[in-house]
Amino acid sequence: MDKAVLDDVIRRLLEGKGGKQVQLSESEIRQLCVHARQIFLSQPILLELRAPMRVCGDIHGQYQDLLRLFEYGGYPPAANYLFLGDYVDRGKQSLETICLLLAYKIRYPDKIFLLRGNHEEAKINRIYGFYDECKRRFNVRLWKIFTDCFNCLPVSALIDDKILCMHGGLSPELESLDQIKEIQRPTEIPDSGLLCDLLWSDPDSSIEGWAESDRGVSCTFGPDVVAEFLDKNDLDLVCRGHQVVEDGYEFFAKRRLVTIFSAPNYGGEFDNAGALLSVDDSLVCSFEILKPADRASGSSSKMNFKKPPKMGKI
């Protein structure tokens, strides 16, 4: 995809502030999906990334809040970004949201990284809004092209060999990170098993071990599971999205797992803040908060993680 064309697409998308709809052509969106899909498949399913990195949780079609996140954190390529999935559904502007992220991915493939969420899956976004938005603004064919692209997204990322990121959480099947590398793409999300859990599971402070999930899919896991997994794999932190949390971020398991959610006033039904996690090159984590009412930002908690020796470029 020509850089000038791509830059023009990005420029038009960035003009969509204040809730203004940006209508790209069907051909442009198709090109975004096809080119991004090729890049996703050319990069590992378990991304190995280097700090500094800004980490964002669920966006869910809240395009104005995505633009606000970039205003706070810096527009690519000024900063490196990792998104934890759930770009579409529920919000009013799923198309603008996913198109801007795909355009940035193509333009700056080593500066912005997109993981798969449980909503980047046909049988889910068929129901929760993305299908209807595609059909209303374009056609069902285009929705199917997005499905082909989503089926190639990576599912996990490792920052400096110490911070493991995914959309959902851990799995009773996951013992070694090498198992993630063995997942073949393109793939749909199965109803059970490792890939399902990575995108669907949740922490639960009231249990030990594993339990069934109220979602009716996947499972929940206790703080003991987090500690055991991190110790066994010489990791410091699990970073995930998937759940609305009041302050935009929430720690679990003695600060060894953090949930990041980046859609403030989620769906217009919650009074939650959104958060942007910044990991500096010493693995100090700090949070930028998008408040629900006035959307004012403010930095919050900081914590240190031991940085491993540099082993050359990965």
Curated annotation (Swiss-Prot):
Basic residues: compositionally biased ranges: 304-314
Query: Does the record carry Hydrolase as a key word?
Result: yes
An example Pfam family from this entry, by short name, is Metallophos
Binding sites annotated in the UniProt record for Mn(2+) 1: D58, H60, D86
Annotated region (Disordered) at 295-314
Needed cofactors: Mn(2+)
Q: Where is the active site?
A: H119
The UniProt catalytic activity note for this protein reads: O-phospho-L-seryl-[protein] + H2O = L-seryl-[protein] + phosphate; O-phospho-L-threonyl-[protein] + H2O = L-threonyl-[protein] + phosphate
Q: Read off the CDD domains from this record.
A: MPP_PP1_PPKL
Q: What induces it?
A: By stress.
Alphabetical GO CC annotations of the entry are:
cytoplasm; nucleus
Q: What general EC class does the enzyme of this chain belong to?
A: hydrolase
Going by the UniProt record, its keywords in alphabetical order are: Hydrolase, Manganese, Metal-binding, Protein phosphatase, Stress response
Q: Which residues bind Mn(2+) 2?
A: D86, N118, H167, H242
Q: Name one GO molecular function term.
A: protein serine/threonine phosphatase activity
Protein name as it appears in the record: Serine/threonine-protein phosphatase PP1
Query: Source species, please?
Result: Phaseolus vulgaris
